[in-house]
Amino acid sequence: MDPNTVSSFQVDCFLWHVRKRVADQELGDAPFLDRLRRDQKSLRGRGSTLGLDIKTATRAGKQIVERILKEESDEALKMTMASVPASRYLTDMTLEEMSRDWSMLIPKQKVAGPLCIRMDQAIMDKNIILKANFSVIFDRLETLILLRAFTEEGAIVGEISPLPSLPGHTAEDVKNAVGVLIGGLEWNDNTVRVSETLQRFAWRSSNENGRPPLTPKQKREMAGTIRSEV
């Protein structure tokens, strides 16, 4: 096993522990708490994949961080922070919408790279909007936290989420997954639109009808994928 993979996991475990202590003292806002919950699932998945115990990894991560902090001067820390571009966290969904449990009458699940797509194939003839919470950097989508499909009545009928066992994804991964979800929902004569915020930062453009600018080739590929999976 790559030692860098192990040390990265150990540091991530310790930093999660620190953030959890911050949350326990009620010092975290909604985006902070949301990332904390998502990262916990991701760490569990990575730990299972790597065969590493999280508690043991957390202790090892603490030692790594303490060693780095002893070697780091305040001036070097300031320069490092100044050189790192800051990402922003954008929210289409409320914390309640993100944390709400939902069920499917006719469940369908598909893995597209590092993302998991779930949808209820029982939903027909509905107007649906896709909302997402994600981070952006340099005005481009950086990391998808969670995307969900909502009917006009507020019911959740679809979802795209990162796979805990496969951390890391690109904006292109997200766009492809959105295309698959749209194709699956439209297969049952639903009308789907994407939030303006997601269109702006994933596609850097938006349409009045709420559709991202998918190419004809992408549309054919997405529709074909759904038909072959149904």
Curated annotation (Swiss-Prot):
GO terms for biological process, alphabetical: symbiont-mediated suppression of host cytoplasmic pattern recognition receptor signaling pathway via inhibition of RIG-I activity; symbiont-mediated suppression of host gene expression; symbiont-mediated suppression of host mRNA processing; symbiont-mediated suppression of host PKR/eIFalpha signaling; symbiont-mediated suppression of host type I interferon-mediated signaling pathway
A GO CC term assigned to this protein in UniProt: host cell cytoplasm
A Pfam family hit: Flu_NS1
PTM per Swiss-Prot/TrEMBL: Upon interferon induction, ISGylated via host HERC5; this results in the impairment of NS1 interaction with RNA targets due to its inability to form homodimers and to interact with host EIF2AK2/PKR.
Region (RNA-binding and homodimerization): 1-73
Alphabetized UniProt keyword annotations: Eukaryotic host gene expression shutoff by virus, Host cytoplasm, Host gene expression shutoff by virus, Host mRNA suppression by virus, Host nucleus, Host-virus interaction, Inhibition of host innate immune response by virus, Inhibition of host interferon signaling pathway by virus, Inhibition of host PKR by virus, Inhibition of host pre-mRNA processing by virus, Inhibition of host RIG-I by virus, Inhibition of host RLR pathway by virus, Interferon antiviral system evasion, RNA-binding, Ubl conjugation, Viral immunoevasion
Subcellular location, record wording: Host nucleus; Host cytoplasm
GO MF entries: protein serine/threonine kinase inhibitor activity; RNA binding
HAMAP family: INFV_NS1
Family that this chain belongs to: Belongs to the influenza A viruses NS1 family.
Free-text comment on this protein's domains from its UniProt entry: The dsRNA-binding region is required for suppression of RNA silencing.
Protein name as catalogued: Non-structural protein 1
Organism of provenance: Influenza A virus (strain A/Leningrad/1/1954 H1N1)
Taxonomic placement: Viruses, Riboviria, Orthornavirae, Negarnaviricota, Polyploviricotina
Gene name in the database record: NS
